[in-house]
Design a protein with these regions (language model features):
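N-terminal glycine-rich phosphate-binding loop and ensuing alpha1 helix
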Residues: 2-48
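Conserved acidic residues
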Residues: 3, 42, 90, 121-122
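Short beta-strand segments
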Residues: 8, 95-96, 126-127
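Residues that recognize and position ribonucleotide moieties
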Residues: 14, 100, 139, 189, ...
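Short, structured coil segments at secondary-structure junctions
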Residues: 40, 64-65, 170
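Conserved core of the sugar-phosphate nucleotidyltransferase
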Residues: 44, 102-186, 197, 201, ...
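Short phosphate-binding loop-to-helix
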Residues: 50-116
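Short, conserved phosphate/pyrophosphate- and ester-handling motifs at nucleotide-, phospho-/glycolipid
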Residues: 192
């Protein structure tokens, strides 16, 4: 059974334009993101847009050895469906490029848990009930389920955010993939200037890009002054 990681990336972020090509320790956030995913041992596809602004994203992703597809900016679900049709995985892991410190080992364990369940209709995620820091999120589902969502989802938030049609379906079985500790209060995602400030400090001064999930949380626990840099940031709600 072929599994692929599909990650979405674009330059035109509303709160932090060009964020995926901003740098920490001389390396772009997209490079950090893709490097962290190598621990999952899975092929990675970068789904970006057809906008000219995203040409550098496509060029860099290709240079780094990732697959690349380009599609609609706002209909991100169709972009993922395009990736599925082009690369033909049986199983999809969805992540987003605003997670430069994602833990590939955690992703791999999530894929194994999904496969062990033996149900192709299953939706699995470590964010159904949050225990991991925001920025380590991933989702696992069959390519067939993704294509079904692409055919049937009509609401704008469902198209823009890719998976709501799956995880809001009461009839669909779901598997939460919790951690043994609750670190959900921590934020190591990249959406605002404050997030970028924190990530740059974590990477450049504390080698966070070399730490696994447990190491990241231990680091944050030891430095509450760093946690405070972006503690006030509110995550966008569905439809925003």
């Amino acid at each position: 059974m072929k599994t692929a990681v599909i990650t979405q990336a674009r330059m035109t972020s509303t709160r932090l334009p060009g964020k995926v090509l901003r740098e920490a320790a001389g390396v772009t956030m997209l490079e950090h993101h893709l490097a962290r995913l190598t621990a999952a041992g899975l092929p990675v596809v970068v789904a970006t847009t057809t906008n000219l602004d995203d040409d550098p994203v496509a060029v860099l992703a290709d240079k780094l050895g990732a697959g690349v597809v380009r599609g609609s900016e706002h209909d991100v679900l169709s972009r993922f469906a395009l990736a599925v049709r082009e690369f033909e995985p049986d199983v999809v892991v969805r992540v987003t490029s605003d997670c430069p410190l994602i833990d590939g080992d955690v992703v791999r364990r999530g894929v194994d848990a999904w496969a062990a369940a033996g149900d192709p209709t299953l939706y699995a995620s470590n964010a159904l009930e949050r225990t991991y820091p925001r920025g380590l999120d991933f989702e696992v589902f069959s390519a067939e389920a993704l294509l079904e969502a692409d055919r049937l989802a009509t609401e704008t938030p469902h198209r823009e955010h890719v998976t709501p049609w799956l995880y809001t379906d009461d009839a669909r079985p779901k598997l939460n993939l919790p951690w043994e500790r609750d670190a959900s209060a921590y934020r190591i995602t990249l959406d605002t200037p404050e997030d970028m400030q924190l990530l740059r400090i974590l990477i450049e001064e504390h080698d966070a890009h070399r730490l696994d999930a447990a190491g990241l949380v231990t680091l944050l626990e030891a430095h509450p002054e760093l946690v405070g840099i972006n503690a006030q940031i509110e995550q966008k709600k569905l439809g925003q």
